[in-house]
């Protein structure tokens, strides 16, 4: 079973470009972390200020480790949150078939 994170970020009006830049910085770094199985961001074509991040980790601890990395702390908590109107994070586990 993998641990899944589905996050939705909605940028404040006029701030979508800042969020896109943060995602472009974080994605390649995050993909290299131990325990990261998949990490991909999407943007809504109908609502370009709305972003969806789909992430898979080996387990919940790998996700906690991700949130505690220097780059996550700096770019998300130290920067991106200032430009977000909304941020939701939901977690799931895969169903092995």
Question: What role is predicted for each listed range?
Answer:
Residues 93-97:
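Short hydrophobic/aromatic patches at helix-to-coil boundaries
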Residues 3-32, 37:
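N-terminal first-folded block
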Residues 3-10, 40-67:
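Short, well-ordered beta-strand segments in beta-rich or mixed alpha/beta enzyme
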Residues 14-15, 45, 72:
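Alpha-helical structural elements of signaling/regulatory helical domains
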């Amino acid at each position: 079973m993998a641990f899944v994170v589905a996050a939705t970020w909605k940028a404040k009006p006029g701030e979508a470009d800042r969020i896109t830049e943060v995602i472009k910085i974080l994605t390649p770094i995050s993909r290299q972390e131990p325990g990261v199985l998949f990490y991909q961001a999407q943007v809504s074509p109908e609502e370009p200020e709305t972003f969806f991040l789909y992430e898979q980790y080996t387990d919940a601890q790998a996700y906690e480790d991700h949130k505690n990395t220097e780059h996550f702390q700096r770019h998300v908590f130290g920067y991106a949150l200032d430009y977000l109107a909304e941020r939701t994070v939901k977690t799931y586990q895969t169903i092995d078939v």
